[in-house]
Amino acid sequence: NRQFILCTNNENNICRDVTYERLKKVIENQGYDAGLKYLQVGFVEKKDKFYYEYAGELLKRVRELIELENFIDLPSNTSCALVCTEEDFDSFTAHLPETCRTVYLSNDILPTEEQEQLLMQNNIKVNIVPEYYYSDLED
């Protein structure tokens, strides 16, 4: 049961074209029940912008950060959840997964008092995103 993160500057495309492909073939050929993702880091410009103007762009990148931090694949994992809309949060709290321990909520979701109590009763930690990962960017 191995977990690792491979980081590189991808000089001469060695990460994408060689290492990633090699790992992918090993997983496929050996029949491992494993996951493999290739992520690229980008830059979100914040100069001369208000926080709300670039928060949406940051939110688009949060899923990968959650998966990296928790060594999970969000769609198939029930211990963590990412909720980005009020409607999804209403559905999430109405059908709360028993195994969920952490929920990452978009910064524009405002839980009701009942929803907050439900999360506390079920010992579910709430992290507001993108602030959880990018708190140092707020002016």
In which residue ranges do the predicted regions lie?
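Accessory, often C-terminal, charged low-complexity segments
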Residues: 2-139
